[in-house]
Amino acid sequence: MLGCSNDRGEHGCPIWLGALIGLLASATACGESVFLPYAGAQYEHNSNVFALPNSAVAVLANGDPRLGDSDLKTVVGFEEDYLWDRQRLYANAEGRYFEYDHFGDLSHYEYLARVGLDWKLFSMLDGTLLGSQERVMAAFANRDTQTALAIDIDRHGIAKFNIQIAPEWRLETSVDHHNLDAPIQDFPDYGLTETIGHVAAKYLGFSNLSYGLSADYSDGRYRNAPVVGSYVQTVLDLTMTYAASGLSSFNGAVGHTQRDQGQDQGNISAITGELGYTRKFSGKTSIHIDYSRAVNSYIGAGGSELDSTVNVTLNYQPTFKTGIVLGVQEVWSAFEGQTIPGTDVIGRKDRSPGASFKLNYQALRWLLIQPYVNYQRRTSNEEFFSYSGTVIGIQVLAKKPAPPTR
């Protein structure tokens, strides 16, 4: 279940993933190993499983007026670290099974397999090699044409190479090859393939301030569906991080994004960036506020979207065993560009407020209990895409405690 599918040639294990697994295995003889198995269960109720506006639409979509359902998720997995010299090899494998009470056709399994290497050479070179593959149910809120179960296979191959040019200057580079199989109604082989390159130069000459310039270049294509095709995207940003004190910190980026998608559909030219602020009020309480504006791919219809997002997160740790996380979010989305036949995107604008609550209770060193509540609402100028829903659940996770750090 945790291996790579061999349904088709492109679903096999990538060469880089196999090589990293082999490297991880070979390191066991010469490094310090930490193996952390875990298992858990999660039961939740979702008041609007298919993210539909009302029961009348549900009848048209699947013949059933019911919107909500409960499901039980069971999970088993492990994390493993190998440390030797200045290098770190790590792996994470996880299997999950979801069983739905009413909509039995939605019951399914998922998995995650990830392996990576953080390496350092001398005092000036460092980097990362990371490979991952995940099987996951597609979110219905992001699927324009279906209420049936759809399974995505998401793969990443990431390489990072960084140089400390001088005590004050650092050059960071990375390449991410991303391959997503995302079948939708009438197009079972639909997906997205993209390669994203990143380079950033940072000045670190001040103790509490760093700044620099970053550039990203993405070359991608939507595949195996008519009308949609390739895109090219460039992002240029001025970046900054600032620690005002031991209690407050800021991070920010401002720049421009240009996305060109075939036939002048999905082209976006916009000012983009992010701004974040973190404040520790005490040893128990902190708040994080961030705003971002970014151009993203809309996999549900093969187009582009411009998203503006505000997040506010409050963390409260009253005791060693208990932590509370409160969050509110608002997302404004404008959709552009190519659309797969049967979908409706061009001119669509959404507003999506949400709120969340999670209690982390560390009952024992190896036992975590997490009740949670999430609320999500979306209003759209295309009424079919408006919905609201609440998810209430509890997760129980048993995990071998990590050994104390030396």
Question: Which residue ranges define each predicted feature?
Answer:
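Gram-negative and organellar
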Residues: 30-406
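N-terminal secretory signal peptides that target proteins for export/translocation
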Residues: 1-13
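Cleavable N-terminal signal peptides
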Residues: 18-19, 29-30
